[in-house]
């Protein structure tokens, strides 16, 4: 889990736009965040396997 201070810091509007970054809405992870879902890759995978993300299916070819 992310530190509470870092989550609150990320929620504030940055002084410069380029300093802003995405965080996972579920766990607060700052890396590998899918913009479409607002979740990190780990949370997307867990929620997709549990069937909590509508329209997401496991691919097979």
UniProtKB/Swiss-Prot annotation:
Keywords: Metal-binding, Ribonucleoprotein, Ribosomal protein, RNA-binding, rRNA-binding, Zinc
Binding site for Zn(2+): 24, 27, 40, 43
GO terms under biological process: translation
Pfam families: Ribosomal_S14
Cofactor note: Binds 1 zinc ion per subunit.
GO molecular function: rRNA binding; structural constituent of ribosome; zinc ion binding
Cofactor(s) needed by this chain: Zn(2+)
Entry GO CC: cytoplasm; small ribosomal subunit
Described purpose of this protein according to its UniProt entry: Binds 16S rRNA, required for the assembly of 30S particles and may also be responsible for determining the conformation of the 16S rRNA at the A site.
Sequence similarity: Belongs to the universal ribosomal protein uS14 family. Zinc-binding uS14 subfamily.
Subunit composition and interactions: Part of the 30S ribosomal subunit. Contacts proteins S3 and S10.
Full protein name: Small ribosomal subunit protein uS14B
Annotated source species: Kineococcus radiotolerans (strain ATCC BAA-149 / DSM 14245 / SRS30216)
Upper classification of the organism: Bacteria, Bacillati, Actinomycetota, Actinomycetes, Kineosporiales
Gene: rpsZ
């Amino acid at each position: 889990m992310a530190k509470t201070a870092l989550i609150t810091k990320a929620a504030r509007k940055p002084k410069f736009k380029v300093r802003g970054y995405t965080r996972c809405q579920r766990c607060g992870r700052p890396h590998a965040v899918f913009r479409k879902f607002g979740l990190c890759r780990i949370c997307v995978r867990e929620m997709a396997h549990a069937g909590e993300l509508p329209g997401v299916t496991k691919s097979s070819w």
